[in-house]
Design a protein with these regions (language model features):
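Glycine-rich phosphate-binding loop of ATP-grasp-fold ATP-dependent ligases
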Residues: 24, 162-167, 191-216, 239-241
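Hydrophobic beta-strand scaffold residues
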Residues: 42, 133-134, 162, 192, ...
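Phosphate-binding site of ATP-dependent enzymes
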Residues: 209-300, 328
């Protein structure tokens, strides 16, 4: 970098109104440490559990979160402005007086919120309004991948194998639970998995071996989402995961991992509580002990799934596999994987610093591509309406009144 080259300011947004709030703090801490300080200025942007936004140097130290983080000296409240002229954060905003507040410009935003209000397309929509380049999948891909029910339907259309399942709403369950249970019994054989449609990190998920335990599992899942998915449990299968990096047809698949679980499925505790590094510290076998032909097939399914949702950036695609039979089922696509799947990319020859750098480049490429799309269409409709005195609208109203008469 030359003396005249300005470093890129990256806002890393994390925390959030999500059941995966704490997981997000760990992931963001790893992301912020990965940036090359010679190339990037990192701005931590913390979203509290009640939805307030903050920035400040104390947010860079994960030890500060052991106490009330927002009470630390040097923390300022901010809002991410949707107005394109701000291109970043309004610091210490006063209602109705943004012009007197400091504007902290962000060149790129790096979303690191897992699950609701961050990984589901909502934060991405805000960034689209603000016209700020951002890392990762866009609104549509984020929303589709985050919803297990919608993703399953899309992947099925693309001939990517998924596990059989049924879905229903919380209203269906509360209205007639016996009918829902009868439908499950008609459609699926036990054991089954009961899942909220949109949560991650195994939160709200239960494995049910008989109908007697089904009601309690559905109650738990319905507590975390208004829609519930029930899937056949793949007995004798192993979990195998693959990360994807890139956009469009320029995609790369990582080596495979096989998480080591001591439970019937990989629980929240196994993913995060066994170490301070989140998914990075979970037990796993890399590369997964899968034969080369099956490995290539899993990697190809991961790439196809990422293209199907129109993904960009990086994601971790999770599979259930029966290696001895060559059977594969895609379980889910994580567009904001825990620890950003650093461990998979490291084993694939990409360092954490190089990964975040590549993701920033992809974000800027996507933003440049967006600028090729026209969002303005000039017409004379306003002039015509002004000339007519909006008589057309009044006439329509009169027509309605006459029809009612």
């Amino acid at each position: 970098m030359t003396a005249t080259t300005r470093k890129t300011t990256v806002g890393v947004v994390f925390g959030g109104r999500s059941v995966e709030h704490d997981v997000s703090i760990i992931t963001a801490n790893q992301i912020m440490r990965a940036f090359d300080p010679a190339l990037y200025d990192v701005v931590p942007v913390y979203v509290s559990r009640d939805g307030r936004w903050y920035t400040g140097a104390p947010l860079l130290d994960i030890k500060n979160y052991e106490s009330e983080i927002v009470s630390h000296k040097g923390i300022a409240q901010v809002v991410l402005s949707p107005a394109v002229q701000h291109h970043g954060l309004i610091v210490n905003p006063v209602s109705g007086r943004f012009s007197r507040s400091e504007v902290l410009r962000l060149d790129v935003v790096f979303p690191a919120i897992h699950g609701t209000h961050g990984e589901d397309g909502t934060l991405q929509g805000l960034l689209e309004l603000a016209d700020i380049p951002y890392v990762g999948c866009g609104v549509l891909a984020s929303a589709v991948a985050n919803d297990k029910i919608t993703a399953k339907a899309l992947l099925n259309q693309h001939s990517i194998p998924v596990i059989e399942g049924i879905s229903f709403s919380r209203a269906d369950w509360l209205g007639d639970p016996d009918a829902v249970i009868a439908r499950i019994e008609r459609t699926l054989a036990f054991p089954v998995f009961v899942k909220p449609a949109t949560t991650g990190s195994s939160i709200g998920i239960g494995r049910v071996s008989d109908v007697g335990l089904l009601r309690a599992a559905i109650d738990i899942a319905a507590h975390f989402d208004r829609r519930v998915l029930v899937e056949r449990a793949v007995t004798g299968g192993v979990e195998v995961n693959c990360a994807v990096l890139g956009s469009g047809n320029d995609l790369r698949a990582s080596v495979l991992e096989q998480p080591v679980s001591w439970e019937e499925f990989l629980t929240y505790d196994e993913k995060y509580r066994r170490g301070s590094e989140g998914m990075k510290s979970a037990e796993r076998i890399i590369p997964a002990p899968i034969d080369p032909a099956l490995t290539a097939k899993i990697q190809e399914y991961a790439l196809r799934a990422f293209r199907a949702i129109d993904g960009r950036g990086t994601a971790r695609v999770d599979f259930l596999v029966k290696p001895e039979k060559g059977e594969i089922w895609l379980n889910e696509i994580n567009t904001m994987p825990g620890s950003l799947a650093f461990y998979l990319w490291q084993e694939s020859g990409i360092s954490a610093a190089e990964l975040v750098h590549q993701l920033i480049l992809l974000a800027r490429e996507a933003h440049a591509e967006k600028r090729r799309t026209s969002f303005d269409y000039q017409t004379d409709l306003i002039a015509l309406a002004a000339m007519r005195g909006l008589k057309g609208v009044k006439g329509a109203k009169g027509g309605v009144e006459k029809a009612r008469a």
